[in-house]
């Protein structure tokens, strides 16, 4: 009896797992737990017969003095735990690295030659392994590794090829390479100390470096590849399930085994390419226009994340359609076209856009905005907030420097404006969270959450205005209430001419004070949201309010005339928000 093998876990594998678990804990969802338990179960069940064979046939040996003595199927308890901890660690690393990834945009109907090439590679490895095992001798251990691992890899490659090759390398190569290199180092220490060993005559005798047998290097590379490919296959299936509701009606929570099988056999010809391209466009817009929302979106999951991105894409498209029009009259015409679009969409009340609605959009709206409008989930969103959003756009068009028209006269006017352009969006986000949650939320709590969301939206808009005083002045707009300017002995023209200085800073801080007042009043309702939305919404809110905190500090980081939050600070804010 000995503790040497156990010390390998205590020194190397468990601490690594504890760190990864601590990092990912705030992001862990029920779906993540399901994937983790499923992968660990498959890893343990599939490895036990193989490892038991190695030990019984003395291909792989352990000196009696290095293990505690507890065994199952001749496998030491420490070795069984290795199956668990390796899968746990590699899975968590993959989840951390892939959390920001929006998987639906990597779905594709195309099947390139790479799929066949990969299948040939893994099939050839299986054949080579079979020949090596049947021949015995020095290729025995390598052959056993290949005939055990490569059939699984062949299957996973066949069902998830497009994801494996299309996902960013940080989702594929990196979560394989990092734990593999780490375990190569750990294995080198163990082999040198004799904690375990490969029997001579069953190995090639080739080393990757001094102390690391080539068979061990291949084993850890293939096992980590198996784990990552398995997780990619899970994400591939979930992306299919979430992206195509016409094939998979509304689902909540962990999908059933039957549903997963149905996603596997769905022909790629039935993928809705228009929907995929619409999501690609929406994500590109999100990355470009709002880093705060993009960071927060990664903490949502499934159809909720898809619909939030679709909602944001519509809001950005509508804003650009109005703001980028060549004249005020064209902007007003764009608003009327958007009203007509909403009237038609809600009049028909269909989950998918009708031919009539498509024809209207394609004939009236510039092509670059088609996807954003047609993918708005109007079927389960209320119409009033969207109508109010357009009223906010109407207010923007009332600004006229030449005639001296500045529509924000009082604090109440600013509250109304903030409610229309930001409170409405927060309200719609909460409606989506409540729609997609599997939890039953009492109606009184729903009303409270929606109302508080409106107030929080106003708070965020105050931050936005405080940040953009100079930017707005450049387009002849002053959102500071005229009553505030009068108290400060300023006119809108003064702000446009000189949007900086002590007086402007005092007004900026007044905006921020009101923003944080509303924020403090509304933030308690976040805790009443369903678990799927609580943490992510807090991240979205705190990420944006951090801009306000930066503005309150001296020497904010500026980019294109705006205060920005440094990347590492944004990450710390998100981490803190998720841990509340």
Curated annotation (Swiss-Prot):
<keyword id="KW-0472">Membrane</keyword>
<comment type="similarity">
    <text>In the N-terminal section; belongs to the lycopene beta-cyclase family.</text>
</comment>
<dbReference type="InterPro" id="IPR008949">
    <property type="entry name" value="Isoprenoid_synthase_dom_sf"/>
</dbReference>
<feature type="transmembrane region" description="Helical">
    <location>
        <begin position="116"/>
        <end position="136"/>
    </location>
</feature>
<dbReference type="InterPro" id="IPR033904">
    <property type="entry name" value="Trans_IPPS_HH"/>
</dbReference>
<dbReference type="GO" id="GO:0016020">
    <property type="term" value="C:membrane"/>
</dbReference>
<comment type="pathway">
    <text>Carotenoid biosynthesis; beta-carotene biosynthesis.</text>
</comment>
<keyword id="KW-0413">Isomerase</keyword>
<dbReference type="InterPro" id="IPR002060">
    <property type="entry name" value="Squ/phyt_synthse"/>
</dbReference>
<keyword id="KW-0808">Transferase</keyword>
<feature type="transmembrane region" description="Helical">
    <location>
        <begin position="171"/>
        <end position="191"/>
    </location>
</feature>
<dbReference type="InterPro" id="IPR019845">
    <property type="entry name" value="Squalene/phytoene_synthase_CS"/>
</dbReference>
<dbReference type="GO" id="GO:0004311">
    <property type="term" value="F:geranylgeranyl diphosphate synthase activity"/>
</dbReference>
<keyword id="KW-0325">Glycoprotein</keyword>
<feature type="transmembrane region" description="Helical">
    <location>
        <begin position="35"/>
        <end position="55"/>
    </location>
</feature>
<dbReference type="InterPro" id="IPR044843">
    <property type="entry name" value="Trans_IPPS_bact-type"/>
</dbReference>
<dbReference type="GO" id="GO:0016872">
    <property type="term" value="F:intramolecular lyase activity"/>
</dbReference>
<keyword id="KW-1133">Transmembrane helix</keyword>
<comment type="similarity">
    <text>In the C-terminal section; belongs to the phytoene/squalene synthase family.</text>
</comment>
<feature type="transmembrane region" description="Helical">
    <location>
        <begin position="139"/>
        <end position="159"/>
    </location>
</feature>
<feature type="transmembrane region" description="Helical">
    <location>
        <begin position="214"/>
        <end position="234"/>
    </location>
</feature>
<feature type="transmembrane region" description="Helical">
    <location>
        <begin position="3"/>
        <end position="23"/>
    </location>
</feature>
<dbReference type="GO" id="GO:0016117">
    <property type="term" value="P:carotenoid biosynthetic process"/>
</dbReference>
<dbReference type="Pfam" id="PF00494">
    <property type="entry name" value="SQS_PSY"/>
</dbReference>
<feature type="transmembrane region" description="Helical">
    <location>
        <begin position="65"/>
        <end position="85"/>
    </location>
</feature>
<keyword id="KW-0125">Carotenoid biosynthesis</keyword>
<feature type="glycosylation site" description="N-linked (GlcNAc...) asparagine">
    <location>
        <position position="89"/>
    </location>
</feature>
<comment type="function">
    <text>Bifunctional enzyme; part of the car gene cluster that mediates the biosynthesis of neurosporaxanthin, a carboxylic apocarotenoid acting as an essential protective pigments and leading to orange pigmentation. CarAR catalyzes the first step of the pathway by converting geranylgeranyl diphosphate to phytoene, as well as the later cyclization step that transforms the carB product lycopene into gamma-carotene. CarAR also converts part of gamma-carotene into beta-carotene. Neurosporaxanthin is synthesized from geranyl-geranyl pyrophosphate (GGPP) through several enzymatic activities.</text>
</comment>
<dbReference type="InterPro" id="IPR017825">
    <property type="entry name" value="Lycopene_cyclase_dom"/>
</dbReference>
<comment type="pathway">
    <text>Carotenoid biosynthesis; phytoene biosynthesis; all-trans-phytoene from geranylgeranyl diphosphate: step 1/1.</text>
</comment>
<keyword id="KW-0511">Multifunctional enzyme</keyword>
<protein>
    <recommendedName>
        <fullName>Bifunctional lycopene cyclase/phytoene synthase</fullName>
        <ecNumber>5.5.1.19</ecNumber>
        <ecNumber>2.5.1.32</ecNumber>
    </recommendedName>
</protein>
<dbReference type="GO" id="GO:0051996">
    <property type="term" value="F:squalene synthase [NAD(P)H] activity"/>
</dbReference>
<dbReference type="GO" id="GO:0045436">
    <property type="term" value="F:lycopene beta cyclase activity"/>
</dbReference>
<keyword id="KW-0812">Transmembrane</keyword>
């Amino acid at each position: 009896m000995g503790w040497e093998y156990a010390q390998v876990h205590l020194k190397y594998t468990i601490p690594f797992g504890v760190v990864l678990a601590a990092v990912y804990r705030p992001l862990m969802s029920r779906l993540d737990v399901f994937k983790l338990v499923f992968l660990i179960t498959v890893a343990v069940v599939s490895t036990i017969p193989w490892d038991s064979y190695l030990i019984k046939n003395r291909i792989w040996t352990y000196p009696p003095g290095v293990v505690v003595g507890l065994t199952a199927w001749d496998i030491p308890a420490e070795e069984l735990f290795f199956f668990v901890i390796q899968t746990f660690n590699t899975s968590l690393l993959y989840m951390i690295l892939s959390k920001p990834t929006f998987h639906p945009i990597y779905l594709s109907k195309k099947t390139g030659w790479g799929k066949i090439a990969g299948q040939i590679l893994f099939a050839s490895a299986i054949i080579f392994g079979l020949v090596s095992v049947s021949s015995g001798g020095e290729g025995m251990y390598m052959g056993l590794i290949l005939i055990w691992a490569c059939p699984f890899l062949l299957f996973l490659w066949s069902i998830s090829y497009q994801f494996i090759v299309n996902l960013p390398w940080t989702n594929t190569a990196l979560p394989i390479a990092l734990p593999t290199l780490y375990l190569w180092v750990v294995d080198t220490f163990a082999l040198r100390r004799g904690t375990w060993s490969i029997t001579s005559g069953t190995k090639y005798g080739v080393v990757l470096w001094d102390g690391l047998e080539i068979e061990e290097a291949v084993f850890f590379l293939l096992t980590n590849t198996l784990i990552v490919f398995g997780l990619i296959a899970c994400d591939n299936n979930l992306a299919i399930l979430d992206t195509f509701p016409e094939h998979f009606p509304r689902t909540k929570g962990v999908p059933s085994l039957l549903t997963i099988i149905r996603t596997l056999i769905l022909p790629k010809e039935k993928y809705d390419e228009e929907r995929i391209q619409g999501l690609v466009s929406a994500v590109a817009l999100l990355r470009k226009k709002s880093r705060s929302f993009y960071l927060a979106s990664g903490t949502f999951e499934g159809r909720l994340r898809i619909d939030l991105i679709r909602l944001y894409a519509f809001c950005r498209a509508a804003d650009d359609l109005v703001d980028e029009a060549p004249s005020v009259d064209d902007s007003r015409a764009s608003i009327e076209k958007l009203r007509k679009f909403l009237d038609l969409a809600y009049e028909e009340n269909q989950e998918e856009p009708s031919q009539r609605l498509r024809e209207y959009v394609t004939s009236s709206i510039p092509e670059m905005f088609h996807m954003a409008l047609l993918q708005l989930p109007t079927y389960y969103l209320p119409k009033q907030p969207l109508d109010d959003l357009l009223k906010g756009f109407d207010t923007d068009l009332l600004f006229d420097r030449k005639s001296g028209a500045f529509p924000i006269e009082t604090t109440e006017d600013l509250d109304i404006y903030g409610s229309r352009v930001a409170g409405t969006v927060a309200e719609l986000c909460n409606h989506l969270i409540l729609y997609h949650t599997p939890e039953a939320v009492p109606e009184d709590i729903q009303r409270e959450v929606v109302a508080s969301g409106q107030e929080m939206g106003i708070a965020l808009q105050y931050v936005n205005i405080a940040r953009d005083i100079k930017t707005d002045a450049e387009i002849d707009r002053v959102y500071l209430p005229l009553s505030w300017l009068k108290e400060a002995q300023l006119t809108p023209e003064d702000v446009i001419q000189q949007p900086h200085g002590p007086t402007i800073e005092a007004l900026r801080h007044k905006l921020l004070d009101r923003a944080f007042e509303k924020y403090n009043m509304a933030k308690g309702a976040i805790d009443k949201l369903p678990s799927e939305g609580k943490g992510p919404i807090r991240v979205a809110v705190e990420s944006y309010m951090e801009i306000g905190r930066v503005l309150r500090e001296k020497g904010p980081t500026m980019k294109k005339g705006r205060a920005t939050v440094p990347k590492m600070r944004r990450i710390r804010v998100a981490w803190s928000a998720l841990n509340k």
